Amino acid sequence: MRHKDEVSVVPSDHKVDAEDPAHVAVDLTRLRRRITPRDEWRQMFDENGRLMATHYWRDDMNGVDWEAVLRRYRPLVDRIHSVDDLYDILWETVGELNTSHSYVSPAGLDGDPSLRAGLLGADYGVPTDDGVPIVRVVPGESSDPLAWSPLRAAGVALRDGDVIVAVDGNKLGHDLSLGEALEGSAGRTVELTVRTGDQMRRVAVVPMADEAPLRYHDWVASRRRYVEERSGGRLGYLHVPDMVSNGWAELHRQIVEATRHEGVVADVRFNHGGHTSQLVVERLSRQVLGWDFGKWYDTPATYPQNAVRGPIVMVTNQWAGSDGDIVS
């Protein structure tokens, strides 16, 4: 029996507590095992084949000769030299079914979190012996606490053109990259030595573990500017990243501004899927029934609120998956 991290041997015919002699704890630290990777990879390949055959939604595997597919790919397992190669083979094998929601999810890829490099939310120029120039500090999105560059924190305020000279007193250059200097710094305070023009100063920052939210909002802002420029300000833009709570929140974060225009470009490219597409369709299908006018309004407001004032176009690509594919 396993409970959390403890493995025990207990009777199956009656209940025992932890102090009962019949409750025997197994010390896993004393176990030793020898793994032959190639044997393990063969087992993983064969098990994947059995699982797909057992759980596939159609007994005839949608017309695919599954056993022939396995025979075709199985010899490749004897030619690989890493588990990453095996994952590639499994992806190719499952891909022969041409079926959505058929994934290969590798295990144990998180690594040691204490060694994770910190990120500063900026783009950099070519490093020199004088340091690493900041080409651009990513603006971020003030309404999302996860989408804010550490370099824009209070008391830091680094700008485009500043040069990071050192991290925790360790000088950057050809012998020490910024990435190396920030290794293991995610979520903890580090000191940057920065040159702004002719002035040197030291600032304390807390690097991020993940820039994805920051980069996402920056990308959305760039697409919004593109649509505004190309349409002469007539079209609004919004992006829905997935069909779960995050995407639902993003829709409402962006819809107020988007629906102030004559039409809307609704972007679901790279949508991760989920289950809220029907809600999204209902929300974007809201029709104008009336108008609210106010003395200080720069434009009349729709009734119901945030209804699309004109045509709506949906943009998608091959990376919109599941519910994100259905909606488009």
Located regions from the model:
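Sequence signature of WD/YWTD-type beta-propeller architectures
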Residues: 1-103, 246
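A generic structural motif
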Residues: 10, 125, 193-197
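Solvent-exposed, polar/charged alpha-helical surfaces in well-ordered, non-transmembrane soluble domains
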Residues: 26, 42-46, 50, 67, ...
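Cleft-lining beta-strand/loop regions that shape enzyme active-site pockets
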Residues: 38, 53-55, 61, 144-150, ...
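PDZ/PDZ-like groove recognition
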Residues: 49-72, 123-143, 234
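Extended, small/polar residue-biased N-terminal targeting/export presequences
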Residues: 78-133, 200-203, 208-223
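PDZ/PDZ-like domain segments forming the peptide/carboxylate-binding groove
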Residues: 115-174, 244-245
